């Protein structure tokens, strides 16, 4: 369902899930990250496309399991043949008209054996031919029509090559590996998409917190300008100082405007990711960045979860499983092809169509056959090299799995180290912000006493804005690192209580 086709009822249902607030004359929906992720799972077209891919892979398994369906073949034929021969009594022969009905039922079993039944009904009538010379042939008497009925039971048993359920169920196993791959690819893509949306969300948080800080800077600049204008009118301040205050105010207002424009762009990114290009309200992130120190577990348990959850390792294991199946296929090709074909036939004759079936119980008309055939693959270098190739590829995948485990361990160490560094940086940024705020307040007091200038105040004001901006960035980076850890460990769905894990 495309966002453009949202009905008023659907928009109303979405609005009921949020709280509204006014911000700069604009209606804003306060949205926590949990709700954003829930809507992403419900509406993102990319996730819906992934579900179709998984469903398509599952249908291939059903098809592979039903590959050995029974087969019924029926044919009807008519033939006429004539022949002449020469004898001492003259030239003569016969002409035969035949109608043949054949029906065969066969099925291959999952263990490689094939059985079947064939019923044949043949109705014939012969006419005698005489020829006074070879150029003139005439028919004489016609014999009575008769029918021949036969029922055959056939069984083919492979002993080495193509024998057993393990070999014959290889198509099912390959299809099941395909399902595993589709599910893992879907899981990886889904987590990547959710991580991307969450990262955009935290960017939006950073921008709106910066907007609030910039509003404070604008308020300070406005108050400072009013104070300076009042002091100028009282003759206590030069016009240059007032002009400097006006310049700082314009600079702060311009920065605020740029931040608001940036917020709209990032908000558009969120709505595009959620497949909601048209909404009657804006989006305001209600979550605040946190340190999450209580959510961090010990490195050993985190590494264990990461290794269990990593889709690259799981995909490599699925690839290794498929290589093992392909090795079985090559080994099966190199096996001796030894087959036993058994057949037992019942026959009956009658002057009436299908009347011969009543004679099937006559053992004198029964027949049987047994054929043992075998073939040895001599010098099949192609299959041998193919088998060697699959063994080498299996070993390659095993090494790739170990390499990925080592990579994840280093990545976890890097993330945990970044947590410690970010926490220290955040404490430093907070301390710098407090000092910058004190310095700004002191400088404003000195300005009122005529011991400072508006330019110096603006410099301290910019220092405070930069330090607070750094504090916001540190907190947001902490959230993004924590988000990466949730994705790696497979805890994203559990942490935000999301459906459909």
Q: What residue ranges belong to the model's regions?
A:
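Sec/SRP-type N-terminal targeting helices
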Residues: 48-53, 65-66, 110-134, 141-145, ...
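Bacterial Sec-pathway N-terminal export signals of envelope proteins
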Residues: 2-98, 155-170, 174, 285-321, ...
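A short glycine-centered flexible hinge/capping loop motif at secondary-structure junctions
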Residues: 232-239, 447-451, 488
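Small/polar, glycine/serine/threonine/aspartate-rich low-complexity segments that form flexible
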Residues: 24-28, 76-153, 285-296, 327-332, ...
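C-terminal structured "cap/appendage" subdomains that terminate the fold
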Residues: 439-479
């Amino acid at each position: 369902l495309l966002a453009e086709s949202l009905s008023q009822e659907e928009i109303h249902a979405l609005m009921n899930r949020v709280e509204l607030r006014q911000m700069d004359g604009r209606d804003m929906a306060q949205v926590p990250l949990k709700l954003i992720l829930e809507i992403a799972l419900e509406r993102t077209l990319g996730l819906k496309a992934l579900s179709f891919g998984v469903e398509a892979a599952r249908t291939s398994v059903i098809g592979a399991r039903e590959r050995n369906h029974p087969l019924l073949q029926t044919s009807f034929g008519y033939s006429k043949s004539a022949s002449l021969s020469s004898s001492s009594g003259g030239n003569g022969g016969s002409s035969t008209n035949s109608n043949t009905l054949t029906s065969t039922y066969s099925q291959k079993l999952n263990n490689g054996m094939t059985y079947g039944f064939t019923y044949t009904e043949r109705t014939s009538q012969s006419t005698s031919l005489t020829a006074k010379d070879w150029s003139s042939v005439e028919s004489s008497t016609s014999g009575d029509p008769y029918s021949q009925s036969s029922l055959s039971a056939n069984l083919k048993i492979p002993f080495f090559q193509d024998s057993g359920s393990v070999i014959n169920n290889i198509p099912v196993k390959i299809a099941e590996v395909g399902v595993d791959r589709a599910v893992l690819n879907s899981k990886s893509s889904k987590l990547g998409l959710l991580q991307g949306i969450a990262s955009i969300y935290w960017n939006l948080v950073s921008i709106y917190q910066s907007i609030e800080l910039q509003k404070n800077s604008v308020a300070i600049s406005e108050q400072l300008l009013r104070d300076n204008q009042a002091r100028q009118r009282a003759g206590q301040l030069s016009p240059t100082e007032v002009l400097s205050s006006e310049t700082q105010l314009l600079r702060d207002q311009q920065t605020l405007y740029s931040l608001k424009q940036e917020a709209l762009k990032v908000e558009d990114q969120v709505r595009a990711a959620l497949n909601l290009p048209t909404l009657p309200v804006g989006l305001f992130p209600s979550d605040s960045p946190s340190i999450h120190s209580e959510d961090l577990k010990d490195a050993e348990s985190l590494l264990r979860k990461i290794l269990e959850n990593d889709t690259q390792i799981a995909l490599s294991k699925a690839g290794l499983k498929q290589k093992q199946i392909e090795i079985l296929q090559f080994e099966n090709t190199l096996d001796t092809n030894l087959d036993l074909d058994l057949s037992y036939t019942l026959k009956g004759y009658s002057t009436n169509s299908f009347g011969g079936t009543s004679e099937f119980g006559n053992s004198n008309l029964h027949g049987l056959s047994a054929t043992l055939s075998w073939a040895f693959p001599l010098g099949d270098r192609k299959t041998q090299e193919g088998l060697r190739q699959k063994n080498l590829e299996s070993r390659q995948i095993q090494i790739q799995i170990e390499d990925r485990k080592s990579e994840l361990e280093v990545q976890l160490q890097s993330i945990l180290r970044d947590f410690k560094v970010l926490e220290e940086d955040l404490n430093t940024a907070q301390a710098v912000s407090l000092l910058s705020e004190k310095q700004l307040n002191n400088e404003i007091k000195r300005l009122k006493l005529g011991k400072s200038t508006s330019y110096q105040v603006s410099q301290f004001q910019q220092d405070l804005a930069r330090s607070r901006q750094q504090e916001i960035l540190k907190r947001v980076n902490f959230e993004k690192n924590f988000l990466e850890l949730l994705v790696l460990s497979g805890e994203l769905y559990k942490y935000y209580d999301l459906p459909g894990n």
